Curated annotation (Swiss-Prot):
Belongs to the cyclic nucleotide phosphodiesterase family. PDE7 subfamily. A divalent metal cation 2 binds at D227. Its cofactor is a divalent metal cation. This is High affinity 3',5'-cyclic-AMP phosphodiesterase 7A. It comes from Mus musculus (Mouse). PANTHER family: CYCLIC NUCLEOTIDE PHOSPHODIESTERASE. It holds the Pfam family PDEase_I. One of its GO terms (molecular function) is metal ion binding. Its EC number is 3.1.4.53. Interacts with CBFA2T3. The gene is Pde7a.
Length: 456
């Protein structure tokens, strides 16, 4: 009897001590620091187990800040449930079902520490040295939404077209969601970069004095959606794999048609312009399509020849809507391939990303014995080789004609960057073992690039 009583007292004592303990094993503790320790421990376990990290907002410090903002969280909730609760706004973002739901955006999460810096950057959104990679980090991966919304406001489009700001933000969020973050290059950050470049071109004196609010609206929407739902492979890949998109668009501007139709779908789904007459909405959709279709790199010579012809004759009249639309098409084409026109630090990052996407396609083609597309074989190609050919045969001819049309400081800056970046890549190329055959290789590949590649 005495021994039994002692054991009972010992068990009661152990239970009482356990209930008072703090730290990673205390699920009854109301101490937020203890909950944070448990959360960090769970993150470490997930990383060791090989779980794929979430694309955005998964940093423990961000989660911890959200935890502090939730004053009504009960202390008895387990660490696992806390993590689920804190991540729910990310799950909402990935679900089309909840697109209209009111949730705390990641921008709100970062207001205190980062949003001030992001706003400061937006004050210089017209600067050609704008660092879209830094801006994307400061906005927690929401660069496309933040930048485009700001530009709509900056150009007075919200007031002019009487846009519902909730619908506008929802439309921009849908656009951003429909870009694939797993694409190294054709993702929402690229779309944001192109949109920022388009804004710079719209500010150029010739355009700024002639474009209408309608022109600006179409240009910004087309820039933001020009690669919408890009699969990360090029048109020839879709054709040789009998992809349904190639069949649907009869092997002609397959990706560009898909980007355009996807943009139209989001425009209609958002209801952003539902207050406009049907004729205006139809005209908007058609003109956005004409802008996006102009980014098909296989039609580069067609657009460039027409533009050059007008410049030679001196008959471009920007009071003519058709001529103005052609110039906007050329502006979007420039914005789409302006990476070599940025400073070396930015340009090099873009070069590495697009080459990674090329090589990923080549890896798939090798795996399934499809025949590797030009510029997509990581065993025979190099970033330097691809970039030098790209600049020589596509970028320089386009931006030379653009400088004829708009001979400004920006145009000379862009051409200057192309020259410097090309020289830098040539320097790196000379260090490569196969550099002797580089000239012939990139000339051939660049001609093929114009016809079919560039993952446009």
């Amino acid at each position: 009897m005495g021994i039994t009583l002692i054991w009972c007292l010992a068990l009661v004592l152990i239970k009482w001590i356990t209930s008072k303990r703090r730290g990673a094993i205390s699920y009854d503790s109301s101490d937020q620091t203890a909950l944070y320790i448990r959360m960090l421990g769970d993150v470490r376990v997930r990383s060791r187990a090989g779980f794929e990290t979430e694309r955005r907002g998964s940093h423990p410090y961000i989660d911890f800040r959200i935890f502090h903002s939730q004053s009504d969280i009960e202390a008895s909730v387990s660490a696992r449930n806390i993590r689920r609760l804190l991540s729910f706004q990310r799950y909402l973002r990935s679900s089309r079902v909840f697109r209209g739901a009111t949730v705390c955006s990641s921008l709100d999460i970062l207001d205190e520490d980062y949003n001030g810096q992001a706003k400061c950057m937006l004050e210089k959104v017209g600067n050609w040295n704008f660092d879209i990679f830094l801006f994307d980090r400061l906005t927690n991966g929401n660069s496309l939404v933040s930048l485009t919304f700001h530009l709509f406001s900056l150009h007075g489009l919200i007031e002019y077209f009487h846009l519902d700001m909730v619908k506008l933000r929802r439309f921009l969020v849908m656009i951003q969601e429909d870009y694939h973050s797993q694409n190294p290059y054709h993702n929402a950050v690229h779309a944001a970069d192109v949109t920022q470049a388009m804004h710079c071109y719209l500010k150029e004196p010739k355009l700024a004095s002639s474009v209408t609010p309608w022109d600006i609206l179409l240009s910004l929407i087309a820039a933001a959606t020009h690669d919408l739902d890009h699969p990360g492979v090029n048109q020839p890949f879709l054709i040789k794999t009998n992809h349904y998109l190639a069949t649907l668009y009869k092997n002609s501007s397959v990706l560009e048609n898909h980007h355009w139709r996807s943009a139209v779908g989001l425009l209609r789904e958002s209801g952003l312009f539902s207050h406009l007459p049907l004729e205006s909405r139809q005209e908007m959709e058609a003109q956005i399509g004409a802008l996006i279709l102009a980014t098909d790199i296989s039609r580069q010579n067609e657009y460039l020849s027409l533009f050059r012809s007008h410049l030679d004759k001196g008959d471009l009249h920007l009071d003519d809507g058709r001529h103005r639309h052609l110039v906007l098409q050329m502006a979007l084409k420039c914005a789409d391939i302006c990476n070599p026109c940025r400073n070396w630090e930015l340009s090099k990052q873009w070069s590495e990303k697009v080459t990674e996407e090329f090589f990923h396609q080549g890896d798939i083609e090798k795996k399934y014995h499809l025949g590797v597309s030009p510029l997509c074989d990581r065993q025979t190609e190099s970033i330097a080789n691809i970039q030098i050919g790209f600049m020589t045969y596509l970028v320089e001819p386009l931006f030379t004609e653009w400088a004829r049309f708009s001979d400004t400081r920006l145009s000379q800056t862009m051409l200057g960057h192309v020259g410097l970046n090309k020289a830098s890549w040539k320097g790196l190329q000379r260090q490569q073992p196969s550099s002797e055959d580089a000239n012939a290789a990139f000339e051939l590949n660049s001609q093929l690039l114009t016809q079919e590649n560039r993952l446009s």
